[in-house]
Amino acid sequence: MSNTPIELKGSSFTLSVVHLHEAEPKVIHQALEDKIAQAPAFLKHAPVVLNVSALEDPVNWSAMHKAVSATGLRVIGVSGCKDAQLKAEIEKMGLPILTEGKEKAPRPAPAPQAPAQNTTPVTKTRLIDTPVRSGQRIYAPQCDLIVTSHVSAGAELIADGNIHVYGMMRGRALAGASGDRETQIFCTNLMAELVSIAGEYWLSDQIPAEFYGKAARLQLVENALTVQPLN
């Protein structure tokens, strides 16, 4: 046990940054509502940073903050703020002004190449080959997600496509996050806190006992979540 009541350690987190290109709160609110509707499992109640570097018109910050918060997003900071008055308004509300890392210069465009002949379309897949620990959230937009290691309780996997877990699955798995009801979840050891396909979900105590801790395949059949052995 540590001899001190607290300990400070460096860490890093993956956060979504919302770049504001419009100073009208109502316009921002509607745009965010539309975006959240596309991937509610990933964006609903998500922590975000607001980047205001592209705003040229004066901003009613109180109204803007309320408009963003009304969507369910949780504003944890603001970046890209160069206006002293706006900084003061933001800090008065208790939000930190964050400094982003320097943007890298764009790489030169590659030389044009002749199109390949007889190529076969390849489905994009996000591959994670390290353990997914508690508190981590991994999202695979517009593609499948494959995890070749264990997923701890408190971790969250989200994919617009299918989810494959080739290890112990103790966290939450949400496939078809953008609404695709044809997606599936494949686990070699199903011990999940929650499984969801296109919004249809089971909590851990709803997973049939005969499949708990076993290799399983989940999919929607007639709009209901089902599970069968993974052969």
Curated annotation (Swiss-Prot):
Residues 102-125 are annotated as: Disordered. Gene3D superfamilies: 2.160.20.70, 3.30.70.260. It comes from Escherichia coli O1:K1 / APEC. Cell division inhibitor that blocks the formation of polar Z ring septums. Rapidly oscillates between the poles of the cell to destabilize FtsZ filaments that have formed before they mature into polar Z rings. Prevents FtsZ polymerization. One of its GO terms (biological process) is division septum assembly. InterPro entries: CAP/MinC_C, MinC, MinC_C_sf, MinC_N, Septum_form_inhib_MinC_C. SUPFAM superfamilies: Cell-division inhibitor MinC, C-terminal domain (SSF63848). This is Probable septum site-determining protein MinC. Belongs to the MinC family. The lineage of its organism: Bacteria, Pseudomonadati, Pseudomonadota, Gammaproteobacteria, Enterobacterales. Keywords: Cell cycle, Cell division, Septation. It comes from the Bacteria. The keyword Cell division applies. Interacts with MinD and FtsZ. The keyword Heme does not apply.
